[in-house]
Amino acid sequence: FTAVSDEARAKNAYYTSQESHERYQGLTMWTPTVNIYRDPRWGRGIETYGEDPYLTSRMGVMVVKGLQGTNDGKYDKLHACAKHFAVHSGPEWNRHEFNAENIKPRDLYETYLPPFEALVKEGKVKEVMCAYNRFEGDPCCGSDRLLMQILRDEWGFDGIVLSDCGAIADFYRDYGHKTHPDAESASAAAVLSGTDLE
């Protein structure tokens, strides 16, 4: 993945010299996807490293280190982004309203969280993307438990938390979670729970 980040750096330098700042020209890579692939009906399973939390952790850490480089210079080479935090492994068709409410603590800590923890602690990933789905009733991008208690307090993550595309709007949209009445309350909940960017 070092070659990928070298190319991204070169591409960014070229577009910056042209004063162009469009999509796919920046230095944030929305990868790796370290969700656990448990159900073959999940259409995005091919983006993951499989069903094994340990293997997913090892692969994810290497991707992050390859993309971000050694971090020994004045500037970051680029930012890798661990996604989709957390408990997101399908179903794809209702991901904007799905509530992962039957996850036992042991399954959470032994299956779903280890890859993210490894990327934060070992890989020093710069960004984490919160998922569309809910966890225990709260949208992941508005979950104090996930974003503040686990990610920031337990693991010491001090990077950027960004939402998946449009995930904050899912807090109040009719086809979403309907946990908040409007955009203002949804945005406030996301920020107060630890989401930095939409």
Sequence positions of predicted segments:
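Glycoside hydrolase catalytic-domain context in secreted enzymes
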Residues: F1-E198
